[in-house]
Amino acid sequence: MRVTQEFYEFLRNRINISDVVRQKLALTRKSSNYVGLCPFHQEKTPSFTVSDSKRFFYCFGCKASGDVIKFTSNISGLSYNESAIKLANDYGIEIPKLTVKQKEFYEESDNILNILELANKFFRTQLTPEILNYLYKRNITETTIKEFSIGFAPRNNKFEKFFLDKKIDITKLGQAGLIGKCKNGKIYNLFSNRITIPIRNIYNKIVGFGGRVLGNELPKYLNSFETIVFQKSDILYGEHKAISSSYKKNRSILVEGYFDVIALHQAGFNEVVASLGTSVTESHLHKLWRAGDEIILCLDGDNAGIKASIRTINLALPLVNSEKKISFIRLPSGLDPDDAVNKNGADFFAKLIDKRISLSEMIWHIEYSGKNFRTAEEKANLEKNLKDYCNKISDSNLKASYYRFFKDQIWQNLVTKQKKIITPSSNSVLIASSHCYSELEMLEHAFCALLIKFPIMFAEKDIRDFILNLNFNNKSLEEFRNWYLNEIIDNKVKENEITAIVEKTSFFDIFLLLSKADNLFLDISFNKNNIRLDLLWQWLYKKYYLINLQQEYAISINSNHDFEKVLLYKKEIIKIVNELQVLNESFINQTIT
């Protein structure tokens, strides 16, 4: 009996995988998942994990993985189709009979899948020393060539002859998406003189091919024509290899090209898939979210990559929530993922992953970076664009968080660029002052002094991101901040080694100024050993926010007649002043005690 793909999906949704697994082994709840001793290898410590929400099992020991049907297949020795039938019978689920059209569809599908497997065997036999050398120069190893079944389609009639010898009608190759027809009616091999890369579905069946030209012909890459088994809007290259790793790491990395996937997989990043040169679709996103809660986009940094990012952002915003996330790796200029890992190594790419930015941060980068906002109109347009993004979010809590995030970014990055600094006499909360620095510059120095005196604070991502994203008036100080965060904080340099490292740089004078025991830029009470760092951070953050408010307050008074908005600024300023006064009293009490 043949079972449809739709019925497979019905079983996955209908039957809790933990109920089936529990019949074979004891499971213990751990957070939202279950754990137990793996039935597929000997172990003493449970490494077998089951997730009902993701409808998936994974063993951290032997790497066995799959859905409820795959588990039944592995346990019973039955085929995938037979296991689906067994589960349906065990749970009293009626198996729908195939209609005549469905039978014809699956017969045709089987024929196409068989032709594609034969085509792949042929392509694999055509790898010449020249082709292998090309692949080796791209740092693709012999093991990887075999693992991904990379082949070659020669520029001759061997391909057609191969199938004719097997008594397979040439028109069947067209149904499989392997050949095309010229305007004059002549049939041609779609992948002639191209490296071939088989595209497999989630069940590890070849459903199409990608082809990469050897020379400079265009198009450089192409895919099989779409068929009844191959739709680019649904398939992701590498998905059959990525799913178990994505489940294990609770994330997927989405790139643009075949060789990006191959290079990253070879470097140990097995959770990588590619979108086959097409726009990312809702189907792609939902498929990846079923395996892991986070999708990390790693697209080229050129204009095409930025446009692809914007399309994906607009597609994803109605779908994301506090659990289902999108983030972005920002590649250095001129690098694609393949180049990044081959030229700089796996550790370099791992650091790029660690420094990935959130969806909200990517939106801000796209709308703000490299642009000027000198006029009220330009600023209003920025606010409108950001609001439009927020309005696409369906999750109300997340939408509110995005509004707050963009509001904070506008304060930090736009208001601080105004030349005029307004300090109303009502502001009785003062930071340590100097004849050489404005109050804002004093705060910039104070933030940098935190790097040196309290580096533990920067383990908090929110604090690190806030400091890193500030646009300093003092550009030398900004360069010091970037260097110190990346080279000292991120690399966890030991305290007794820092001075020797900084001494060899152009930042040594700044370092000495900021690291003095009687630091001018931090209040005397902040230098106590028992200072509560959370209060210290609140004080500095609120002080910085207050200065921004004061500047925006002044701009609002001078540039428009929106009195309601002016009153809101004034009310917020008074509120922050009072909060700072309370914090000041806390520090005074600490100093006295």
Curated annotation (Swiss-Prot):
Cofactor, how bound (note): Binds 1 zinc ion per monomer.
Keyword vocabulary terms for this entry: DNA replication, DNA-binding, DNA-directed RNA polymerase, Magnesium, Metal-binding, Nucleotidyltransferase, Primosome, Transcription, Transferase, Zinc, Zinc-finger
Keyword Metal-binding recorded: yes
Pfam name, any one: Zn_ribbon_DnaG
Stretches of the chain forming a coiled coil according to its record: none
Chain positions of all zinc fingers (CHC2-type): 38-62
Sequence positions that bind Mg(2+) 1: E256, D300
UniProt cross-references to PROSITE patterns, sorted A to Z: TOPRIM
Cofactor(s) recorded in Swiss-Prot or TrEMBL: Zn(2+); Mg(2+)
Residues annotated for Mg(2+) 2 binding in this entry: D300, D302
GO terms under cellular component: cytoplasm; DNA-directed RNA polymerase complex; primosome complex
Note on domains (UniProt): Contains an N-terminal zinc-binding domain, a central core domain that contains the primase activity, and a C-terminal DnaB-binding domain.
Family statement: Belongs to the DnaG primase family.
Role of this protein: RNA polymerase that catalyzes the synthesis of short RNA molecules used as primers for DNA polymerase during DNA replication.
Annotated protein name in UniProt: DNA primase
